[in-house]
Amino acid sequence: VGLPDNGIFKIGDTLTEGELIHFRGLPSFSPELFKYIENDDPMKSKQFYKGLEQLMDEGVAQLFVNQFNNRRIVGTVGQLQFEVIQYRLENEYNAKCRWEPVHLYKACWIESDDEKEYENFKKRKYQYMAKDSEGRDVFLADSGYVLSMAQQDFEHIKFHFTSEF
């Protein structure tokens, strides 16, 4: 079956004739590699952001927006994905990007039943906080030690290494 898509469908969407079906969706795993991505041609900003959004929707990589400096961070499981993103942005969207290194250890989706501790955590760890493409809070630990200390200091915060929890 072919369906025209103007961007409303995502991988894993289900169509029915009225039945109420609920799937958990496809999980996103914590990436292994991280880099800042920057638009290399300000005259092509619209193409750059549209291409980046569509590539992330396809699941090529994961995009996080750092809450401290508002920079976009792409997370992947392999170096080749960065090259694929750059190639596709240039050849499919006529947009150029450049990569800048960022040292991160792990991306953890966080949640808590203790709203006060949750807000305190986000406030104290502001420089490590980001949002994923779905608007969920993500803690970007720059070392195993930082992650371990956060888990120890905030025992009511749950740290998840996949986005489905």
Show where each model-derived region lies.
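Structural and coupling elements of P-loop NTPases
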Residues: 1-165
